[in-house]
Amino acid sequence: MIKKIKASRSEKIIFIFIILLAVFSFSSFFAIKDKCLFVKDYDPLKITFDNPKNIAILNVPCGNVIIELYPNVSPNAVERFKTLIKSKAYDDIAFHRVIKDTLVQAGDLEFGKKGNLNYGKIGTGKSGLGNINSEVDVPFNFEKGSVALARTQKNNTEDSQFFIILRDEPLYETEYTPIGKVIYGLEALKKIKYLDKSQYVLRPDYINTLRMLIN
C-alpha cells in the first residue's frame, strides 16, 4: 500500500499563491484583450506614406498609433521630439494625464517611468535637455488627432511632454506648439486608462515603444 504524503502548511500556501497568480494573469490578459477587441491595429510596413521620414509609430496597449510630424510647422519642437524618440526615451513612460474623449498626455521622462513612477511629482518632470521656445506663429487647425507639446502656464517651457487631442480644440491654436497629427490608430488612444474624477491616473497605461519609421 502506497503511503500518502501530507502537504505541509507552507506547501499549501505556496500552491494557493501559484493558483491565484495564474488566475490573476489569465484574467488580466483577457481584460486587455476585451478592451482592445474592436480596435484595429495598423501595420506601418503595409502602408505607403508620402513623407516616411516624418512618421512616428506610438505603440500603446491596444496597438499602433501612427503620427505624421510637421517640421514645416514647428521645426525645433519636431527636432526635439525626434531626438527623444531616437534615444528611446519615451519607452515605458506613463500616460499620466487622461481626460475621457478629450486628450491623453505623456512624456514625463523624469517621474513617469514604469517601475519608478512618482505620483507626487508626475507631470512636472523634464528631459534634461532644457526647455525650447513655443512655436505658434504658423496657423494650425487643432482638430481631432492633433499632437502638441505640453508646457507650463508660461510660454517657452516646452520640453518632452506631449498630448494628443481626441476631439477638435480650436481654442488651442496659438496656445500650444503643434508637432503633428495622428493619421491612423486614434481609436487605440481612446482606450487608454482614465479616471472619472481626476485627470491624473493611478496605475496608468504606458507607452510600450515610440519609434521613427525611418531612423
Ranges and model annotations:
Residues M1-N215:
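Cyclophilin-like peptidyl-prolyl cis-trans isomerases
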